A protein has these predicted regions:
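RecB-family 4Fe-4S metal-dependent nuclease core
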Residues: 1-153
Length: 153
């Protein structure tokens, strides 16, 4: 669990601080020296446009590891006193492996993204955004008011 401060993102202030439970599955965690390197295995083809989203995903995993209890870490075979120093991802179809040091900007970005999601939740602001690859397969499509607009069809 982490605390998202009401002022995490000044552009999207929250009404109060929130305790957020993080949950996810990390594909692999490697130990290198005195630190850990989580690795994500991905399907699909690598493209450079995926760099920023991958960094955010890995920053989420770093938050998850570093805010887990000692018992949870030990159960997963991890030493509680070691930090995540790097992160990595692997796209087998493209034979692409990337490893880099943790980026502070990515850590800040993922916290702000969580704050923005809470901000939207508090205000019930979830505007529909059409994307042809996903909207057509959404189970909500048939009753989505925005999906029925003439400009989408």
């Amino acid at each position: 669990e982490i605390i998202i401060d009401a002022n995490t993102d000044p552009k999207y202030p929250l009404r109060r601080d929130y305790k957020v439970h993080l949950q996810g599955i990390i594909d692999r965690v490697f130990r290198e020296g005195d630190g850990y390197i989580p690795m994500e295995f991905k399907t699909g083809k690598w493209s450079d446009s995926k760099m920023s989203p991958m960094r955010k995903e890995m920053a989420f995993y770093k938050l998850m590891i570093e805010n887990s209890s000692e018992a949870v870490l030990r159960q997963a075979g991890l030493e509680p006193n070691l930090d995540v120093t790097h992160w990595s991802w692997y796209y087998p179809i493209s034979n692409f492996i990337h490893v880099e040091k943790v980026k502070k900007t990515s850590m800040t970005s993922v916290l702000k993204s969580i704050a923005r999601l809470i901000h939207a939740y508090e205000r019930k602001l979830f505007p529909a955004k059409f994307f042809y690859k996903t909207c057509a397969h959404c189970s909500y499509f048939g009753i989505c008011e925005a999906a029925q607009e003439d400009t989408w069809l």
